[in-house]
């Protein structure tokens, strides 16, 4: 049973595709098996820029299986993602955000939970 995956949403405006994901607790391989196929369907290449809003709530990290799935997804879409905004509450979540940088060409920024509107604005900018 999945623990960490909570929600996936798509918002499209003015040639920008923003995919929102919400996670909490610990992400495991089963979480990835649930949401990656949904992501792949949203990733249809139609020329739009793809950006992610990732909201972490009481996030504790990844299992090894989840890290492997994340690595595979990241390498497959290395050039496809333009920006990633990670919204969280604590230092651990910020460190996890820093860990993702080598696995993507996307510009990655961490925003505190209180700054979620700033994160959304940044993702919506051209």
List the model feature ranges, each with a label.
Residues 2-126:
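Amphipathic, Lys/Arg-enriched alpha-helical "gate/interface" segment within cytosolic domains
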């Amino acid at each position: 049973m999945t623990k960490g995956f909570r929600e996936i949403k798509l918002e499209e405006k003015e040639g920008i595709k923003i995919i929102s994901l919400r996670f909490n607790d610990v992400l495991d391989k089963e979480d990835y098996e649930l949401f990656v196929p949904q992501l792949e369907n949203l990733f249809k290449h139609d020329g739009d820029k793809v950006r992610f809003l990732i909201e972490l709530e009481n996030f504790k990290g990844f299992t090894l299986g989840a890290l492997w799935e994340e690595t595979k997804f990241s390498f497959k879409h290395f050039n496809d993602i333009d920006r990633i905004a990670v919204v969280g509450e604590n230092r651990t979540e910020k460190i996890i955000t820093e860990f993702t940088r080598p696995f993507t060409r996307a510009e990655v920024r961490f925003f505190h939970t209180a700054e979620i509107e700033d994160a959304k604005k940044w993702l919506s900018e051209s």
